[in-house]
C-alpha cells in the first residue's frame, strides 16, 4: 500500500512513529551480537548456587542448542526425553524454579528449537512411513507412537502459558493495569514469564503447521501486534510471528490482511539488512524473507492492491515476469501458483502418527494443503480476464461476454457468482486478529439481473498532501 493510500486507510496494527521503529532497529543491532551459547549461561549468577541449579542451566543450554541435521533416530528420541525432563521439572517442582535467565533472546531459542525438532521429527516419521524402505526404523517408530507426539507438545506449550499466567498479564497491560497483580507466584519469575510468552508464539506456529489457521490467530488475542511487543525485540520471533500470521490470513482468504502483515516485516527487514549479516540466524531470516516475497506475490495476484514502494520494487526485481503471469491468470498460471506456494508455505505436519502397515494411505500434509489452496486458485483463474472486459462497460449482456470468453453462458454465470462472493473480504480494523469488517476487495462491482450485468466502478481519490507531509518528515 502506498503512503498516500495509508492516509485514507483504517489504522494499521501498531502504527507507531518512525522514532519508535528506529529504536527497535537499534535494539536489534545489539541483538545481532548476542551469544546465547553455554558460556552465556555459565556467566549467569542464579539465585540458587547448588549443583541442581547448574544441572538445570546445562539442560536449558542444551534445549536452546540446535540438533545436528543428520542426527540419528536414537538421538531424536533422547532429545525428546531431555525436553520432557526439563519441562517436567520447571512445571511440576515444589514452587517456582529459582533461576535467572540471560535474556529473552535465550527463552525464544528454547521454544523455537523445541518446536523445530517436533516439526522435523513428524516430517521424518511421515517420510519413513510413506517410503516403506527402512523396516528397522519403521518398527522403532511404530513402537514409540507418543514420542514427539502432538498432544505432548501442545500440552507443554499450554502448561507454560497457564503456569506463567501470561495471558492474564498481557490482558491487564491492554487494560492499563499492573500485570504483576495477575502474575501469581510463577508468572512473576522471568523464567516462567518469558517461556510462557514465547509459548504463545509457539502455539501460533504449531496450530498453523497443523492447518488450524483460525485457532492459530486466536492464540494471539492478548498480544498486541506492534513494535512495542516483546516478540518484536527478538528478530527471529518477530519474523516468525508475522510470517505465520500472514500465512494464516492468506489461507483464510483475507488477502488484504496477509499483505499488510508481510509488508510490515519485509519493510523492517529491509532496514536492518546491513547488520543482519554475520548474525546467527541470518541464513534462516534470508530464506524466510524470500518465502514471504513469494507469498506476497501470490496475494497481490489474487487481490490486486497498491504496495509500499520498497516492497513493490523488491517484488518486481525478484518476480517481475512471474508476477505478470500470475496477475494475467488463466490455466498457464496454475503451475506457477503451485510452485511458489510449495516453496513458501510452512512444512505442514499431521497431528497423528502415520500408518506404517499401509504406506499408500499416508498423505503428505504439504500435498494436502497445496491441493486445498489450488482449488481456491482455480476458482479465480479467469477473474483478471473477466475484469478487463467488465471495466469497459456499465451494462453488458451475459451472452455477449460469454462469446468474448468462448465459454458456455451458464459456466460464466458460475464464475461471476464465485467472483462476486470472493470480492467481499473480512479486513481487520480493531480487536483480535480474527475480528474484522466485510469490505469490497476491489474497486469494481457488478450485479446480475437475469442475463444483464450491471457494472459499477469506484476510484479513491489520491491524497497527495498526506503523502508529501509523511515523506518530508522522513527527510527533515
Curated annotation (Swiss-Prot):
Subcellular location as annotated = Cytoplasm
Keywords in alphabetical order, please: Cytoplasm, Initiation factor, Protein biosynthesis
GO CC, sorted alphabetically, is:
eukaryotic 43S preinitiation complex; eukaryotic 48S preinitiation complex; eukaryotic translation initiation factor 3 complex
Gene Ontology terms: biological process: formation of cytoplasmic translation initiation complex
User: Where's the PCI domain?
Assistant: 257-452
Q: Name one GO molecular function term.
A: translation initiation factor activity
Protein origin, superkingdom: Eukaryota
Q: How does it assemble?
A: Component of the eukaryotic translation initiation factor 3 (eIF-3) complex.
Tell me, in a sentence or two, what this protein's role is.
Component of the eukaryotic translation initiation factor 3 (eIF-3) complex, which is involved in protein synthesis of a specialized repertoire of mRNAs and, together with other initiation factors, stimulates binding of mRNA and methionyl-tRNAi to the 40S ribosome. The eIF-3 complex specifically targets and initiates translation of a subset of mRNAs involved in cell proliferation.
**Family matches, as PANTHER family:** EUKARYOTIC TRANSLATION INITIATION FACTOR 3, EUKARYOTIC TRANSLATION INITIATION FACTOR 3 SUBUNIT L
Q: Which family does it belong to?
A: Belongs to the eIF-3 subunit L family.
Could you identify this protein by its name?
Eukaryotic translation initiation factor 3 subunit L
Amino acid at each position: 500500500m502506498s503512503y498516500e493510500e495509508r492516509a485514507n486507510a483504517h489504522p494499521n496494527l501498531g502504527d507507531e512513529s518512525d522514532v519508535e521503529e528506529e529504536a527497535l532497529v537499534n535494539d536489534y543491532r545489539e541483538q545481532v551480537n548476542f551469544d546465547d551459547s553455554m558460556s552465556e549461561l555459565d556467566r549467569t549468577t542464579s539465585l540458587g548456587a547448588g549443583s541442581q541449579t547448574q544441572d538445570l542451566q546445562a539442560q536449558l543450554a542444551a534445549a536452546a542448542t540446535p540438533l545436528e541435521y543428520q542426527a540419528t533416530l536414537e538421538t531424536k528420541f533422547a532429545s525428546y526425553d531431555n525436553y520432557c525432563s526439563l519441562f517436567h521439572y520447571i512445571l511440576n517442582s515444589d514452587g517456582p524454579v529459582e533461576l535467572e535467565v540471560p535474556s529473552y533472546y535465550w527463552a525464544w531459542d528454547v521454544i523455537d528449537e523445541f518446536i523445530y525438532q517436533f516439526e522435523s521429527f513428524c516430517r521424518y516419521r511421515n517420510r519413513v512411513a510413506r517410503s516403506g524402505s527402512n523396516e528397522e526404523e519403521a518398527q522403532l517408530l511404530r513402537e514409540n507412537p507418543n514420542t514427539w507426539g502432538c498432544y505432548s507438545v501442545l500440552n507443554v506449550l499450554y502448561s507454560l502459558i497457564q503456569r506463567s499466567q501470561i495471558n492474564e498479564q498481557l490482558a491487564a497491560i491492554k487494560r492499563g493495569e499492573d500485570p504483576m497483580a495477575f502474575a501469581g507466584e510463577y508468572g512473576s519469575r522471568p523464567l516462567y514469564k518469558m517461556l510462557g510468552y514465547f509459548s504463545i508464539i509457539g502455539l501460533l506456529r504449531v496450530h498453523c503447521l497443523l492447518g488450524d489457521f483460525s485457532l492459530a490467530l486466536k492464540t494471539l488475542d492478548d498480544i498486541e501486534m506492534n513494535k512495542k511487543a516483546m516478540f518484536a525485540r527478538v528478530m527471529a520471533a518477530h519474523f516468525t510471528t508475522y510470517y505465520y500470521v500472514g500465512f494464516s490470513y492468506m489461507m483464510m482468504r483475507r488477502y488484504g490482511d496477509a499483505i499488510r502483515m508481510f509488508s510490515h516485516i519485509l519493510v523492517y527487514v529491509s532496514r536492518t539488512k546491513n547488520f543482519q549479516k554475520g548474525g546467527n540466524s541470518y541464513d534462516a531470516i534470508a530464506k524466510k524473507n524470500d518465502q514471504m516475497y513469494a507469498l506476497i506475490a501470490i496475494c497481490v495476484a489474487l487481490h490486486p492492491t497498491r504496495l509500499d514502494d520498497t516492497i513493490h520494487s523488491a517484488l518486481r526485481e525478484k518476480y517481475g515476469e512471474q508476477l505478470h503471469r500470475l496477475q494475467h491468470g488463466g490455466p498457464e498460471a496454475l503451475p506457477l501458483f503451485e510452485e511458489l506456494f510449495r516453496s513458501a508455505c510452512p512444512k505442514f505436519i499431521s497431528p497423528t502418527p502415520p500408518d506404517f502397515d499401509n504406506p499408500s494411505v499416508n498423505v503428505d500434509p504439504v500435498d494436502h494443503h497445496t491441493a486445498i489452496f489450488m482449488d481456491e486458485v482455480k476458482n479465480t483463474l479467469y477473474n483478471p480476464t473477466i475484469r478487463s472486459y467488465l471495466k469497459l462497460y456499465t451494462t453488458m449482456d451475459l451472452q455477449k461476454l460469454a462469446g468474448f470468453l468462448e465459454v458456455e453462458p451458464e459456466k460464466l454465470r458460475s464464475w461471476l457468482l464465485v467472483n462476486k462472493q470472493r470480492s467481499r473480504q473480512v479486513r481487520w480494523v480493531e480487536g483480535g486478529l480474527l475480528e474484522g469488517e466485510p469490505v469490497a476487495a476491489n474497486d469494481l462491482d457488478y450485479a446480475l439481473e437475469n442475463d444483464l450485468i450491471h457494472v459499477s466502478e469506484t476510484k479513491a481519490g489520491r491524497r497527495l498532501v498526506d503523502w508529501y507531509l509523511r515523506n518530508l518528515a522522513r527527510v527533515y
